[in-house]
């Protein structure tokens, strides 16, 4: 469902998500593979940014948030367009998470990040330039890094 929101976009994907690469290909979404995912999130961000460096903004998301709603992604992009801030993120009770949008003016700072770190440092550095989308359900922020997240008791 989230991929449908991204039609017309380009993606950088860690190589372990073959099913996402396949689905993106079926939907004609260009995919750029991170050949060294062990180098961390920053390399995936940089590969993605290099492929879209002439765009006005870039949305970063992760593929392990099974409760993230497509409507939330759409609302976030609309918020970014309407608020005219340099960044936009989703938030629940003060906790910021993915997806996040960064305007082109932050691309250089994003390219300087190293290791297994994302753009949170930049968000904290420029709080006056961030628009926040308050989400309705905290589960949208939850990562599914562990298999037990998908047990019957957790799928609500």
Region annotations inferred by a language model:
Residues 1-13:
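Single conserved hydrophobic/aromatic residue that forms the stacking wall/gate
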Residues 5-6, 67, 101, 132, ...:
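Short aromatic/basic micro-patch
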Residues 7-8, 26-28, 106, 126:
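Short, structured coil segments at secondary-structure junctions
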Residues 18-25:
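Acidic helix N-cap motif at the loop->helix transition within catalytic regions
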Residues 27-39:
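Conserved donor nucleotide-binding strand/loop of the catalytic core
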Residues 32-34, 90, 133, 144:
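Hydrophobic residues at beta-strand termini and immediately following loops
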Residues 38-104:
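Conserved beta-loop-beta/alpha segment of the NTase-like Rossmann-fold superfamily
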Residues 108, 112-156:
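Conserved alpha/beta core of the MobA/IspD/sugar-nucleotide pyrophosphorylase nucleotidyltransferase superfamily
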């Amino acid at each position: 469902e989230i991929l449908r929101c991204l039609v017309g976009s380009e993606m950088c994907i860690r190589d372990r998500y073959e099913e996402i690469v396949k689905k993106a290909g079926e939907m004609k979404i260009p995919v750029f593979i991170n050949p060294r995912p062990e180098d961390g999130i920053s390399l995936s961000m940089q590969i993605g940014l290099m492929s879209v460096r002439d765009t006005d903004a870039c949305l970063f998301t992760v593929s392990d948030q099974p409760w993230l709603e497509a409507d939330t992604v759409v609302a976030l992009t609309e918020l970014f367009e309407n608020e005219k801030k340099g960044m936009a993120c989703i938030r629940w009770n003060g906790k910021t998470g993915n997806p996040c949008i960064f305007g082109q003016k932050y691309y250089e700072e994003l390219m300087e990040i190293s290791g297994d770190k994302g753009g949170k440092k930049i968000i904290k550095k420029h709080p006056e330039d961030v628009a926040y989308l308050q989400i309705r359900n905290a589960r949208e922020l939850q990562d599914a890094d562990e298999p037990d997240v998908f047990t019957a008791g957790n799928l609500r």
